Amino acid sequence: MHNLAIALHNGKHQVTGSDDQIFEPSRSRLLAKGLLPPFDGWEASRIDSQLDAIILGMHARKDNPELLRAQELGLNIFSYPEFLFEISKEMTRVVIAGSHGKTTTTAMVLHVMHHAGVPTNYMV
């Protein structure tokens, strides 16, 4: 999730987050971008109607106080894969799958796209 937070931040979106624990290297990377939460854990008061969306980590429990508050406020709530789909649904997508060679194939495709002058984004 921290890579998504950093990517959104780099895209000029206002980003906040929370988790029960944040480990290295995520902690240092978030700190360097000014995105490290001020404390570990969840607090319902951090969720208000000004938020555009909530993106849940895969370990978020149904009784998470921030999730409950977001539901109470009727906020848009996405899982990580749902959010990735939402932001890319109008884009042409290339999916590379298989047992071996996915990262290498992805790098080759990106290299070709870059040299062809085609703007691209990627997710590995």
Spans of features found by a protein language model:
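Short alpha-helical
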Residues: I22-P25, R61-K62
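Short acidic active-site motifs
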Residues: P25, Q50, F83
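Short alpha-helix adjacent to the SAM-binding motif of class I
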Residues: R27-R29
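Short amphipathic alpha-helix with an adjacent loop that forms part of the alpha/beta core around
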Residues: G41-Q50
